[in-house]
Amino acid sequence: MARLKLIIAYAGTRYAGWQIQCLPAGRPHAVQQPTVQQAVEDAAKAILGSAVRVHGAGRTDSGVHAEGQVAHLDIPDAKAAVDWRRALNAKLPEDISVLQAAVVPDGFHARFDAVKKRYTYRIWLTRAFVLPQRRPFVHMTGPLDIAAMDAAAAFMTGTHDFASFQNAGTELATTVRTVYSITRTPGLAPDDFPRSHDTTPRAPLELAWHFEADGFLKQMVRNMMGLLLWTGTGRCAPEDVPAIIAARDRRLSAPTAPACGLTMERVFYPDECCPPES
């Protein structure tokens, strides 16, 4: 058998997340919700003629997008020469795309070998219309105190127990994680869109927050973003963040930010395990 590594992009809007969902016991009429993992497994099965398990690096939530999800699967050696990127894309729906496919060492594991992940959360800051498929974002029209949000983000970086930012539903040995950075960049700018001869400088139409960590708890990025939005709208002060972290109580933090603004950007691996992404 050969191990195949995939880098996958998808629009998560119509999927119940990455992971295949188990039907609840005692509900014979329950409907299986579509997931990205199931779609990729179905595509691989159509090529191989038999079922195969696909392992993802991260279990993105329902409605969350990806530009760099990593997965692996095992294929017969005789199929290693197949152009897997093209073959899978021919079987996948149009909102899922395999960007890269390559045979890697047998010991590679998409989830357990990951050393860092990057997620981006985008906010659209104007009433101006833009096609939803143009970019994943959350639409906001009120003012945001960006300086306060940056200050709050600084308190969230470092190694902490992030239990206050984990939603229920996952049992873990530890809720300690290391957040390497939370940075902010402008996304789409006004000059990306046609306008008149007016050259007056205009504020960005979109802002993006980038989160990098050794790993994230269930809905941790969306919960951190929810607290940043609380701070930006004056619901709490940046100086409140350390106490919220220390409390280890999800009820004391902000509501979870909507899934539609979040994208899994990239998964990082050590060089000795897998060549760095170009």
From Swiss-Prot:
Substrate binds at residue 119. Its EC number is 5.4.99.12. The active site is at residue 61. GO terms for biological process: tRNA pseudouridine synthesis. It holds the Pfam family PseudoU_synth_1. Signal peptide: none annotated. GO terms for molecular function: RNA binding; tRNA pseudouridine(38-40) synthase activity. Keywords: Isomerase, tRNA processing. The keyword Ribonucleoprotein does not apply. It comes from the Bacteria. It catalyses: uridine(38/39/40) in tRNA = pseudouridine(38/39/40) in tRNA. NCBIfam families: hisT_truA (TIGR00071). Formation of pseudouridine at positions 38, 39 and 40 in the anticodon stem and loop of transfer RNAs. Homodimer. Belongs to the tRNA pseudouridine synthase TruA family. PANTHER family: PSEUDOURIDYLATE SYNTHASE, TRNA PSEUDOURIDINE SYNTHASE-LIKE 1. This is tRNA pseudouridine synthase A. The lineage of its organism: Bacteria, Pseudomonadati, Thermodesulfobacteriota, Desulfovibrionia, Desulfovibrionales.
